[in-house]
Amino acid sequence: MLGEALELPSIEPKGKERIVSQHIRYTGVQRTGPESLRHFRRTFKQALRRQLITGTYDPVHPVIVPTHDDRRYRSWKVKSEPETNAVIIYMMDVSGSMGDEQKEIVRIESFWIDTWLRKHYKGLETRYIIHDAVAREVDRETFFHTRESGGTMISSAYKLCKEMIDAEYGPSAWNVYPFHFSDGDNWSADDTRVCVDILRDRMLPAVNLFCYGQVESPYGSGQFVKDLRETVGPFENVSLSEIADKDAIYASIKQFLGKGK
């Protein structure tokens, strides 16, 4: 429904090595097998058939007693299926300028992002990083309910995100989606240059799509999205969005996921 409403294209996973999982599929019935796989309905059907043929079935006293030869068991085969796994790494500025209204926008948007990506990937993991001047990994509940009073150093989140990718989500086996939300404030122009270097040289070559959503705040300068647009905006796997309020969420999701990455 989301895809139809926003006219989103289906995602095409990167040409990566897929993880192969094995599943047992029941394919029929056979005469031998473990008791745990006995097919009781077919066993009783075979016993009834035998009793009807031999004339031992009594309709007045319809007792069906299967013999050893009547027993039937499910047959199976192991089927190998490729599974394409993905991870979303959410990052969010939790400094004082990101209030409850901004976090609510991020929460709603992340719900729909999760919903869309789960449609395309059986194995979807989500990780959460919060940052002010220092970044740390947290659980989902902490992600949406933490507020700090310090300044903002965005590079700390990007460094932690890249370390996470290097350690656990190699691009040969994973489709990686980092999403970062902030109000556009950063500690300094020098730190913004560090962010750009991390993105351009280290993160973008390893991910399917990097998305930055700038949530409007009365306290944020809004400069960061401008800097990203000038430096990494032309990259094919970068998507930048400015989110003025809740009414802009749908347009932001379409901007993020409209590339089919």
For the regions a language model picked out, list residue spans one by one:
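Acidic, glycine-rich A-domain
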Residues: R38, T43, T67-H68, S75-I89, ...
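Acidic/polar low-complexity segments with low predicted structural confidence
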Residues: M1-T84
